[in-house]
C-alpha cells in the first residue's frame, strides 16, 4: 500500500526536446514550477534514447531541429510507444505544420509562445483534467 501511495505522489517525468538552449532552459524551469520532472534533450538521438528508456508521462517536441524534425521524431516514438502522450510546442504555426504533427501521432499542438495554454494542456494530457485546447 505504501508503495502505491509513493508512486502516485511521485513527480511525473516529461521529455522536452528542443535544439534551442534558451527554450530548453525555460522549459526546465516551467516544468519544475508546474510540479513535473523535466527530462531535457537537445537532439533527436538523445530524445529517442530517453523515450526508449520509458517511464515518461508526456513528450513535448519542437517541430524543427538542426538534424531532423519533430514530425519524424514523433513517428519514431510512435513506432515503439503508442501510449505516452505527445504534444508539439513549436514556433511552426502554419495549419499544415499543425496537421502534420497531429497526423504523426501527437495529441496536441501549441504554437510558441502560448504560455496560457501550456500547463492546462500538459495537465489534460497527463491527468485527463482541464479544458481541451489546440492553439
Task: Mark where each language-model region is.
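Non-catalytic signal-transmission and effector/linker regions of two-component phosphorelay proteins
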Residues: 1-13, 117-135
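Conserved acidic segment of CheY-like receiver
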Residues: 11-22, 27-31, 59
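Acidic, metal-coordinating helix/loop segments flanking the phosphotransfer/catalytic sites
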Residues: 40-58
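Acidic catalytic/metal-coordinating carboxylates
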Residues: 43, 69-72
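Short amphipathic alpha-helix used as the core "switch/output" element in two-component signaling
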Residues: 71-82
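Alpha4 helix (beta4-alpha4-beta5 surface) of REC/receiver domains from two-component response regulators
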Residues: 72, 93-111, 115-120
Amino acid at each position: 500500500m505504501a508503495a502505491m501511495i509513493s508512486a502516485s505522489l511521485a513527480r511525473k517525468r516529461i521529455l522536452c526536446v528542443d535544439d534551442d538552449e534558451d527554450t530548453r532552459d525555460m522549459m526546465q524551469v516551467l516544468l519544475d514550477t508546474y510540479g513535473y520532472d523535466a527530462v531535457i534533450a537537445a537532439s533527436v538521438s538523445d530524445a529517442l534514447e530517453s523515450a526508449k528508456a520509458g517511464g515518461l508521462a508526456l513528450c513535448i517536441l519542437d517541430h524543427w531541429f538542426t538534424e531532423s524534425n519533430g514530425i519524424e521524431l514523433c513517428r519514431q516514438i510512435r513506432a515503439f510507444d503508442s501510449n505516452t502522450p505527445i504534444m508539439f510546442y513549436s514556433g511552426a504555426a502554419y495549419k499544415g505544420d499543425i496537421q502534420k504533427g497531429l497526423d504523426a501521432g501527437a495529441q496536441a499542438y501549441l504554437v510558441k509562445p502560448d504560455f496560457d495554454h501550456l500547463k492546462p494542456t500538459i495537465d489534460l494530457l497527463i491527468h485527463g483534467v482541464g479544458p481541451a485546447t489546440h492553439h
